[in-house]
Amino acid sequence: MSQQHTLPVTLSPALSQELLKTVPPPVNTQQEQMKQPTPLPPPCQKVPVELPVEVPSKQEEKHMTAVKGLPEQECEQQQQEPQEQELQQQHWEQHEEHQKAENPEQQLKQEKAQRDQQLNEQLEEEKKLLDQRLDQELVKRDEQLGMKKEQLLELPEQQEQHLKHLEQQEGQLELPEQQEGQLKHLEQQEGQLKHLEQQEGQLEVPEEQVGQLKYLEQQEGQLKHLDQQEGQLKHLDQQEGQLKHLDQQEGQLKHLDQQEGQLKHLDQQEGQLELPEQQEGQLKHLEQQEGQLKHLEHEEGQLEVPEEQVGQLKYLEQQEGQLKHLDQQEGQLELPEQQEGQLKHLEQQEGQLKHLEHQKGQLEVPEEQVGQLKYLEQQEGQLKHLDQQEGQLELPEQQEGQLKHLEQQEGQLKHLEHQEGQLEVPEEQVGQLKYLEQQEGQLKHLDQQEGQLKHLDQQEKQLELPEQQVGQLKHLEQQEGQLEVPEEQVGQLKYLEQQEGQLKHLDQQEGQLELPEQQEGQLKHLEQQEGQLKHLEHQEGQLEVPEEQVGQLKYLEQQEGQLKHLDQQEGQLKHLDQQEKQLELPEQQVGQLKHLEQQEGQLEHLEGQEGQLEHLEHQEGQLGLPEQQVWQLKQLEKQEGQPKNLEEEEGQLKHLVQQEGQLEQQEGQVEHLEEQVGQLKHLEEQEGQLKYLEQQQGQLEVPEQQVGQPKHLEQEEKQLELPEQQEGQLKHLEKQEAQLELPEQQVGQPKHLEQQEKQLEHPEQKDGQLKHLEQQEGQLKNLEQQKGQLEQPVFAPAPGQVQDIQPALPTKGEVLLPVEQQQQKQEVQWPPKHK
């Protein structure tokens, strides 16, 4: 090597160009490099030089000795060529090391592909040989059977019954007692024949004995034939042993099928847990199985019995399928399609958890219970994962059907999502639909958690859980004991039950929107899934885990313990986030508190307007509306329900008091009456809701024992509607602000309030409305009590408001059609329709 570097290198330009053309560029793969040997100039073509992966020193010495006899120019070319080869080799080694560092998985895949090709070729050759052997042996058997039939036809009539009996014995592979007696009788006859042959030599055979001798000769032929049959019976016994061996191999095949199910489960776990240590252990296990396959192939070549080989061929074909399945699984180690769906599902769950955390920050939930609930939810999810894994280890066949069913369900869900995207939902209903879909998902999740809590006690008795899980179960029992709702939350439960009625009302509205049929199908689909989960849990209690799977279960349990530890840490982080959110009131609550304060001021203002309403009732039907008052009506119509601008309204009211004797003042008061009509409509809507809530309160008697974790989860679930109501109130206030700032645009408001203005002249409906307002007064008191119990107050007017507003009802001669229509709609909507 040192001599080659010290020699001078002088090349003509033509030779250097030729050498540059002959030098191939570095190739990415080893196979292409081996296919392209370096061509040499014409004088040096006798010396074959190919680029191996590693060039040993002996070849270089031989190469140097072969070059000595050539002229100087040729030697210089040959000296230049090994230097170039060394440079190429160094470059190739660096490239190979870089490829090894970058692509270890590609090398493994290539090696496994080569192994699979070799195994497939060997298996095909062995199949051909076995087929040839089977054909030859079948031909031999056919020939033997033909010979047997010919021999059986040649036998005398006396032996026909005996031969039929022997054929039956061949089918049964057992020697009956009658045949054994006949064999003994024939052996005795053989002894007699030998004795008679001795006597033949000594005595002259008389004529009587000649017939006996012929008979004995016939019996000798029969004895030989019986000996042949005995050999055939022994051969049949051997075949019977081979059949037993085949039965044992069938048992092994069943065992391998079970192992296939376990391998599939392990591959799923490989996709789910991106842990390199698990993958290494599983790869070692796969290599062991490949070694077992080679051992079985070696045994296959040694077996001579055709029937055994047939079973082994089937076994090897199954193992080929296993190898292909394992290769597919190795390719799927990087996030398979199932993982992507699971990740999407987890992202959706994270969004729901964030939404729940935001709502928990708004509500006064005890801090201890928040962390416990999250911990329980995490543990319940882990228990579900354990149940699925156990069901997968014990029920591989059922899993295949369930996987097909789940794929069908995924297709149905995609189809439903596609249909949802095609339907045009109004903008106002879009937010409600999204919110209701989230609530439905949360309700289903909570129902699943309730079923899992009931099933926990059964699982404690049936499953042999490791020590980590035993401690976790004890911790769960302690948490269940701690999750008794305090007395302060009992009032919240009642309030949430009332909100449950509002949720049902929203469900009705959702049914009236454009997607009722899809949601019903989804609900039925989820109910079917719940039934399947219950069925799997029931099967899990009945099945006993085999001994081979115990080790796998322990391994999985260790992994689950690690996952639980990570989930606990995540739960602690989420708990800290919740505490931070609880320390600061969210912006929505601040706006709601201001809104409620403004509403309280508005109620006091309404009580002050009671006297004015009494005076206006007499003057409404008598006075016509001049043009100036029409403009004031339109201007004041847009000021109804504006709690932020109460000071402006007070100034307007003072102006109206000064103009009591004038028509303009009366028109302004009429407009104010229209404002109160809108408030009455709002109160009527609340009244319908309160009636429905009172019915539900009578129906839902919450026992003290059940006021546990499920009720607490229902609280969170039912309080999900509050932010949406608050958003609606904020939008309403923003609209009112915009209306106050733009009085010129108020002229073009809808004519609905003008119609109400004309319809206020009919007092015939006063009596029903008075009763309705009296009922409403009691419901408003109940709302005030609930407002004191919760930090999120409810719209609660003063108790004397309704009685004060009663004189402000319309006079005779007018009809309140919109109010009646709204009442009829509310009566139709409550109670909810059960489809």
UniProtKB/Swiss-Prot annotation:
Biased amino acid composition, Polar residues: 1-15, 776-789
InterPro entries referenced in this protein's UniProt entry, alphabetically: Involucrin_CS, Involucrin_N, Involucrin_rpt, LRR_dom_sf
GO CC annotation: cornified envelope; cytoplasm
Annotated compartments: Cytoplasm
First and last residue of the signal peptide: none
Maturation and modification: Substrate of transglutaminase. Specific glutamines or lysines are cross-linked to keratins, desmoplakin and to inter involucrin molecules.
Any Gene Ontology biological process: keratinization
Statement: the UniProt record of this protein carries the keyword Cytoplasm: yes
Region (Disordered): 1-133, 150-206, 221-285, 321-342, 381-428, 446-486, 501-548, 566-809
Record flagged with keyword DNA-binding: no
Keyword list, A-Z: Cytoplasm, Keratinization, Repeat
Tissue specificity of this protein: Keratinocytes of epidermis and other stratified squamous epithelia.
Entry-linked Pfam families: Involucrin, Involucrin_N
Domain of life: Eukaryota
Compositional bias ranges of the Low complexity kind: 76-91, 169-181, 269-281, 329-341, 389-401, 509-521, 655-668, 693-710
UniProt biased composition (Basic and acidic residues): 92-115, 159-168, 182-198, 222-268, 402-421, 446-464, 522-541, 566-584, 594-620, 669-685, 711-721, 729-738, 751-775
Cysteines joined through disulfide linkages: none
Role played: Part of the insoluble cornified cell envelope (CE) of stratified squamous epithelia.
Family: Belongs to the involucrin family.
Summary of subunit composition and partner proteins: Directly or indirectly cross-linked to cornifelin (CNFN).
Protein name: Involucrin
Organism, scientific name: Pongo pygmaeus (Bornean orangutan)
